[in-house]
Amino acid sequence: MQQKTDVILIGAGIMSATLGSLLKELAPEWEIKVFEKLASAGEESSNEWNNAGTGHSALCELNYTSEKADGSIDISKAVKVNEQFQLSRQFWAYLVKSKLIRNPQDFIMPLPHMSLVQGKKNVEFLKNRFEALSKNPLFQGMEFSDAPETLKKWLPLIMEGRTSNEPMAATKIDSGTDVNFGALTRMLFDYLKTKNVELNYKHSVENIKRTKNGLWEVKVHDMNSGKIEHHTAKFVFIGGGGGSLPLLQKTGIPESKHIGGFPVSGLFMVCKNQKVVEQHHAKVYGKAKVGAPPMSVPHLDTRYIDNKKALLFGPFAGFSPKFLKTGSNLDLIGSVKPNNVLTMLAAGVKEMGLTKYLIQQVMLSHEKRMLDFPAFIPNAKSEDWDIVVAGQRVQVIKDTDAGGKGTLQFGTEVVSAADGSIAALLGASPGASTAVHVMLEVLEKCFPSRMIEWEEKIKEMIPSYGISLTENPRLFQDLHTSTGRTLGLNEKETVHN
């Protein structure tokens, strides 16, 4: 028997949670069903231990600002990422203000974001970056210093025991955040439950196919009872993290062809000495080694997990053929199809450097990983640190005009059918931080005829929707202050509601 509904969301992560929340505000009468393979929400890529928890707004991530041939800095990508994070901030503030979610300090905390570099050339790059960003209102309040005494105040743990005379510099901005995406995801699904969204955990989606009358039929395995169910919907969103690509391929839509996925696993070192944890209070991003991929940017992060302060260092990359942490070793080989095999092979040839890098990373022992610490913590002791396996990220491989056949993509990407009846989210960073922007893109692609009708409500929830904050500094200032107040970020006050 087929069970009909309006919307099916596959995967109970931050993306489905965000899209479901937007739809329930815009079209409250629509029936929504969620299917999640695991036992609860936010357990894969959205889980707090499976991602870096950075509110990515390009305040400290150096890979969002590239150096041009003439030495000037291109800040366009940084501005774009920051603008996108502001949309998330505004939507979260709307949810808190409307009492749809409570206690924002359980998912977002104010935390300085810093960039740290060593060596004369890198110091020059950071100074140029600081000067370029400082002209933009989104980055106001950023400070730069190459004075050792200032760096000792900003970064006591990092500067302690440092003997090298090599030039160092840092930038610091206090408006950064640490975001617990696992906690936020669980809050959003708790809210959706009150809106009669049907949440089905331990339900694995086995197949997706088009019916004769233009609906989508989703075949679901109920892992609790062992039964197979068939559900139909007018619109399906595939938000299954690394598991999205295999499901997208099952749809057979033309847009799913010539796309591959390359899985990369991440490892972090977590500090178990609370005295060391208390000596650091920032997210500090360094610069990737020459030739290393963007996902290898080292960072030392204060995190707030279960309302307790933690300290993580990494990431160290790894390789596993699984597309999900809880996936199968056959995921990668199973994703190779006649329509994408040449794309995948081309990427294999192009990305020999990445493959070599990942093999080297996999071979690292605990003690070898500790050798990466002196750049960040000269006095780090091996016994103070344990390894934590983070989530899998599946980088998109596709044919592009700029990069040619088999080009590895490092962002997130929405793939949708021409008629807007189904969409999938592929890719990785900046991911969760830009969830609201990405899900608005899904709405624009899949419900174009409803956008005029929905615009007023969208602007009530997300006031800067469709507006450049860079070009409207006054609006940015007003929204930054008001959302900061609602989310408890302006001062470290606790918001109870």
Swiss-Prot record:
Keywords: FAD, Flavoprotein, Oxidoreductase, Tricarboxylic acid cycle. Its EC number is 1.1.5.4. The keyword Flavoprotein applies. GO terms for cellular component: cytoplasm. GO terms for biological process: tricarboxylic acid cycle. It comes from the Bacteria. NCBIfam families: mal_quin_oxido, PRK05257.1-1, PRK05257.1-3, PRK05257.1-4, PRK05257.2-1, PRK05257.2-4, PRK05257.3-2, PRK13339.1. This is Probable malate:quinone oxidoreductase. It comes from Bacillus cereus (strain ATCC 14579 / DSM 31 / CCUG 7414 / JCM 2152 / NBRC 15305 / NCIMB 9373 / NCTC 2599 / NRRL B-3711). The gene is mqo.
